């Protein structure tokens, strides 16, 4: 590659620190000055010092990587990865903690493709690709003597530390006050945020002691006292938030179909275990509650599906959302392939109606009592407009693009509400199918979303915000239950009691494990009656 110019290594590292500070860390600078704009008394010297401290800190962090043969590939990689992180932070206010790194690593190609748009490509080219290419086009001059190289680097680091110390002496109270009231700021510095989170994820995933696989409910027994077998549909939703459910008080009729099904109960105060699928799905199926949840333990442990299966129930998992996060690994699974159904699929993803295809044949092949779990794509963003067919474009105008921050709020909400309305249509179709089976089975449907979604409130989009910082839109989720008269009678359920509890009491994914076991009348030591949200209403 031709050499464009020559530069000494120490000034180059300082220049790189400045580029990262002013370009890729533009989101945190904006956040910092947004915070300061709401304070009554701000010292001008403190404001000016922020960028100097950021440059100095990055210079200290970067200096150890300024050695020959490492500098260019290392910083080229930082430019490329930092560019994507910077864009996501700037546009969606995404926070790159360990959970977000897990989400990225577990993302499938179809999901990753949905985030591509003109804006991110332009940003990536100018802040990631071009700087990386330019870096390889310069001639770096290193000190001839190794000890001079060490001495110059130490002097540069000491100068940066001295500047930081000087600023701290003058404005420590100001930094402490802002930091104390805005605890996420230190997690927004690029590349330290995602580099540290990636290190933690790799360490915890690949370099910690392997957790022995734990079986659950080996003592499980089920009392079968009904003439008819049971058929349960368990529907795991994607990215639906309670706030936009008309059954929960939303002004728009997003539950236009299930509201006409008759007997559908909506749980108005349901909360998720996490703010991302990678956490919420394994957590809701596990016997751990949210505060004690451990991903490693969950991935090396059985869940309530395994326990129900041990009691003789036939299980089937139908997957339309890119993967079950390990919860279906020990039960029969049907993976929906877009290539198999061009009518309901676009080659990459499928509309959730596809879950009803071949369902009757699949049920017929399952002996005895049956549980069919559906993992739907639901309201998966940012390409909300691809989640429903043309005939379900009810709320208009829609946001037919993936860079949703460039749509109007009306367009964005319209499109998201269309996804909920379409999911509601699919659920109503499932309920109708269960009604048709009610002569052969006692039937029941339970629908619950994995997490919610932000639609631009407070500048936040999508989901994945750390739970303790997440807004209600990302954690307050819908759950619906429908039961056939035969199921209600067989389980001795007081529906008035259940409706009252669903309207007034608060529940969460923590309740799902024991509630499902309870509905199946499973007796086991891991069943917790206090977490069974149906128990209080059973005679």
What is the role of each PLM region?
Residues 168-234, 239-400, 476, 504, ...:
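Active-site-proximal alpha/beta segments of enzymes that process anionic O-linked groups
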Residues 288-290, 411-412, 494-500:
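Flexible glycine/proline-enriched surface loops and loop-helix/loop-strand junctions
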Residues 271, 317-319, 371-378, 417-423, ...:
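Short beta-strand segments
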Residues 237-239, 311, 423-426, 430-433, ...:
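Conserved beta-strand->loop/alpha-helix structural units within folded catalytic cores of enzymes
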Residues 189, 357-361, 399-443, 481, ...:
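A long, amphipathic alpha-helix that forms part
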Residues 1-187:
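Transmembrane and membrane-interface helices of multi-pass
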Residues 220-222, 462-470, 499-501:
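Short, P/G- and charge-enriched loop/turn segments at secondary-structure junctions
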Residues 249-253, 439-442, 446-492, 527-529:
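Histidine-centered active-site microenvironments of extracellular/periplasmic hydrolases
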């Amino acid at each position: 590659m031709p050499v464009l110019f020559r530069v000494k290594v120490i000034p180059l590292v300082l220049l790189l620190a400045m580029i990262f500070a002013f370009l890729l860390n533009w989101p945190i600078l904006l956040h910092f000055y947004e915070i300061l704009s709401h304070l009554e008394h701000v010292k001008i010297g403190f404001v000016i010092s922020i960028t100097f401290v950021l440059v100095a800190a990055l210079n200290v962090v970067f200096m150890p990587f300024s050695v020959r043969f490492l500098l260019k590939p290392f910083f080229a990689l930082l430019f490329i990865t930092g560019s994507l992180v910077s864009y996501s932070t700037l546009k969606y206010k995404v926070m790159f903690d360990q959970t977000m790194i897990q989400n990225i690593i577990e993302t499938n190609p179809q999901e990753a493709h949905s985030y591509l748009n003109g804006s991110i490509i332009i940003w990536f080219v100018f802040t990631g690709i071009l700087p990386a290419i330019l870096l390889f086009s310069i001639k770096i001059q290193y000190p001839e003597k190794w000890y001079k190289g060490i001495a110059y680097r130490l002097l540069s680091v000491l100068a940066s530390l001295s500047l930081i110390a000087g600023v701290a002496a003058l404005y420590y109270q100001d930094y402490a006050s802002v930091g104390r009231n805005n605890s996420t700021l230190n997690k927004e510095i690029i590349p330290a945020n995602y580099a540290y989170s990636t290190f933690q994820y790799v360490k915890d995933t690949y370099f910690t002691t392997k957790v022995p696989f734990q079986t659950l409910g080996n003592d499980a027994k089920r009392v079968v006292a009904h003439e008819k077998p049971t058929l349960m549909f368990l529907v795991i939703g994607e990215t639906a938030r309670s706030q936009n459910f008309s059954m929960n008080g939303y002004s728009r009729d997003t539950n236009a179909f299930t509201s006409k099904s008759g007997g559908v109960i909506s749980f108005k105060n349901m909360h998720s275990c996490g703010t991302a699928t990678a956490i919420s799905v394994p957590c809701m199926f596990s016997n751990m509650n949210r505060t004690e949840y451990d991903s490693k333990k969950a991935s090396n442990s059985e869940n309530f599906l395994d326990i129900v299966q041990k009691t003789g129930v036939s299980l089937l998992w139908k997957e339309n959302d890119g993967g079950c996060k390990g919860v279906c690994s020990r039960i029969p699974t049907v993976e929906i392939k877009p290539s198999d159904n061009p009518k309901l699929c676009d080659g990459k993803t499928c509309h959730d109606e596809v879950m009803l295809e071949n369902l009757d044949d699949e049920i017929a092949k399952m002996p005895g009592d049956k549980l069919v779990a559906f993992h739907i794509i639901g309201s998966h963003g940012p390409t909300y407009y691809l989640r429903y067919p043309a005939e379900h474009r009810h709320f208009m105008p829609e946001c037919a693009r993936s860079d949703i921050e460039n749509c109007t709020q009306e367009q964005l909400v319209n499109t998201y509400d269309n996804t909920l309305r379409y999911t509601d249509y699919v659920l109503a179709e499932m309920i109708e199918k269960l009604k048709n089976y009610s002569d052969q089975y006692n039937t029941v449907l339970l629908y619950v979303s994995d997490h919610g979604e932000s639609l631009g409130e407070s500048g936040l989009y999508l989901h994945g915000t750390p739970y303790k910082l997440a807004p209600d839109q990302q954690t307050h989720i819908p759950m619906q239950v429908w039961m056939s008269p035969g199921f209600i009678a067989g389980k001795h359920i007081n529906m008035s009691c259940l409706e009252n509890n669903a309207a007034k009491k608060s529940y969460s994914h923590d309740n799902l494990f024991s509630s499902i076991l309870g509905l199946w009348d499973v007796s086991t030591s891991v069943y917790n009656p206090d977490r069974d949200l149906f128990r209080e209403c059973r005679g």
